[in-house]
């Protein structure tokens, strides 16, 4: 479902957060690299925001230009992660909204969204800073995991990973995000 023509951050992130309260995430179509979404925020935010819904990609540069290899690598890796890890459970994901109230999220400077597979074997949490974010730490508490299971947690920004129990993730992990709209 094309839920909005507003693809510009930070509103696009807020729309995804809100629409996943009414629709399953695989029915929330999110576009990357089109309809002015390139005007604000990092490419990371646009791509990762789209990964939490039905991801649609547009062109990432003029047809006659050579694509920036860093952009190509990031988009390719992200699409691979989406296809191999998120999309297999997206149509039946349990959705949790750590920041359900847009007004409160704006005051806090960030919004987050958690998707978990029905068998609780995999999940993803996206955290996105808004225009008011001045940089710093954000405490995230998973809500949909199994407390007794152990999960390999991968931090997509730097690729680091660690093993954590569901109980530890539900107590919270801290993410450092240095800037707004990332």
PLM regions and their residue ranges:
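Catalytic cores of secreted or luminal carbohydrate-active enzymes
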Residues: 47-99
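Short, solvent-exposed coil/turn linker segments
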Residues: 80, 90, 125, 164-166
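C-terminal beta-sandwich/jelly-roll accessory domains of carbohydrate-active enzymes
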Residues: 131-182
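Intrinsically disordered, low-complexity coil segments
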Residues: 28, 39-40, 64-71, 98-107
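Conserved structural scaffold segments of CAZyme catalytic domains across common CAZy folds
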Residues: 67, 74, 96, 121-123, ...
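Glycan-recognition surfaces
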Residues: 1-66
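Carbohydrate-binding surface patches
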Residues: 102-147
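Conserved, mostly hydrophobic/aromatic
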Residues: 50, 125, 153
């Amino acid at each position: 479902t094309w839920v909005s023509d507003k693809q510009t951050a930070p509103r696009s992130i807020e729309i995804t957060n809100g629409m996943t309260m009414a629709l399953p995430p695989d029915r929330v179509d999110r576009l990357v690299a089109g309809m002015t979404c390139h005007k604000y925020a990092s490419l990371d935010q646009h791509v990762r925001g789209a990964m939490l819904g039905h991801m649609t990609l547009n062109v990432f540069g003029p047809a006659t230009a050579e694509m920036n290899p860093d952009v190509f690598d990031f988009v390719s890796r992200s699409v691979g992660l989406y296809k191999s890890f998120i999309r297999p459970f997206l149509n039946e994901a349990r959705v949790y909204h750590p920041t359900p109230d847009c007004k409160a999220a704006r005051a806090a400077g960030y919004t987050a969204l958690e998707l978990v597979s029905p068998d609780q074997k995999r999940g993803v949490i996206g955290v996105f800073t808004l225009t008011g974010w001045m940089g710093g730490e954000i405490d995230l508490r998973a809500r949909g995991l199994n407390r007794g299971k152990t999960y390999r947690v991968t931090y997509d920004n730097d690729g680091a990973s660690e093993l954590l129990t569901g109980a530890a993730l539900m107590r919270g992990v801290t993410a450092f995000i240095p800037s707004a709209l990332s």
